[in-house]
Design a protein with these regions (language model features):
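RNase H-like, Mg2+-dependent phosphodiesterase core
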Residues: 1-141
Length: 141
């Protein structure tokens, strides 16, 4: 429903290899930059002007040359940030459901890739699969 009501939105994604290469924080910033780029493309397609100010949840991104504000606990204070968080979570959950079919035995459909007991049991039983982050697994294995 959020997507249908929004004037525009953008989704940015990076894979596990990028996260392993540049770390989770930098990968998050990269994905957020991609999301802003997609947002601006969608706005342009809709005939709207580009984004001129961005609110982020507890983060600033130097690569984005648009005025921005970091809002601590932004998803609890700003409706647009909360909506973006929901879009991100639903998108990730759908991707993990697809991975559950592709890589059975890790309970991705339930744990969404988070470090749950069932997920760790799947790793111990089957080893890692191509979507696992090696940097995270160093802490676990």
């Amino acid at each position: 429903m959020i997507k249908e009501k929004a004037i525009a939105f953008g989704i940015g994604m990076v894979d596990n290899k990028v996260i392993d290469d540049i770390n989770i924080l930098q990968a998050t910033k990269k994905a957020m930059t991609m999301a802003v780029d997609e947002l601006n493309r969608m706005l342009e397609t809709n005939g709207s002007r580009q984004t001129d100010y961005i609110l982020f949840d507890a983060m600033k991104i130097d690569d984005i040359k648009i005025p921005q504000e970091s809002v601590i606990k932004g998803d609890a204070k700003v409706l647009a940030i909360a909506a973006a968080s929901i879009i991100a979570k639903v998108t990730r959950d759908r991707i993990m459901a697809e991975y559950a079919a592709e890589y059975p035995g890790y309970s991705f459909e339930k744990n969404k890739g988070y470090g749950t007991k069932q997920h760790y049991e799947g790793i111990k039983k089957q080893g890692i699969c191509p979507i696992h982050r090696k940097t995270f697994l160093k802490k676990v294995l």
